[in-house]
Amino acid sequence: EAASAFQEMCAAAVGDGAYFYGVLGYRSYEDQKSAWETIALYNGESYAEANAAKEGASEHQSGLAVNIASTYESEKEFTDTEAYQWCKENAASYGFIERYPSGKESITGFTAEPDHYRYVGKDIAQAVAASGLTYDEYYALYLAPWNDEALKPDSITSNHASASASPISTAQAAAAAPSASSG
């Protein structure tokens, strides 16, 4: 589902003149362990803890995360590219959120990673985008409290998303639970 949504998003972006590709998607436990150890070896453990996930805690191991790079603007910072602007404006329509936004490090626990997008499904992505919250904040406020279906109101997104957003089920909330960490 996430891979299909990403392909659909890339095709739409190309149609709008924005070009990007997935640099990193799924990463195995062993590959994540090796990546973290390499980062820690060359940069120190405190740097690695703030900038990478240990094995077993990476969103990339879920198959729901993708790091994006601009195809034709490689000399620029990703945040200065047309690809980034397109993703900021459109990714939620395809079920993706910018997982670690700038200025929210104290909330997410990670250094800003503007190229790291997480698939959470269209309904949740659009609700998160409309709320202006990080995914961690949105999950804690609106998704996690409704584990008991009997306690969940008809629509937990009605005050925080556009009128077209549909209610989010407990199953969607559980599937969309944030991972402990990024890349």
What are the functions of these language-model segments?
Residues 1-160:
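Cell-envelope/glycan interface and biosynthesis
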Residues 152-183:
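Ser/Thr/Gly/Pro-rich low-complexity, disordered linker/stalk segments of secreted
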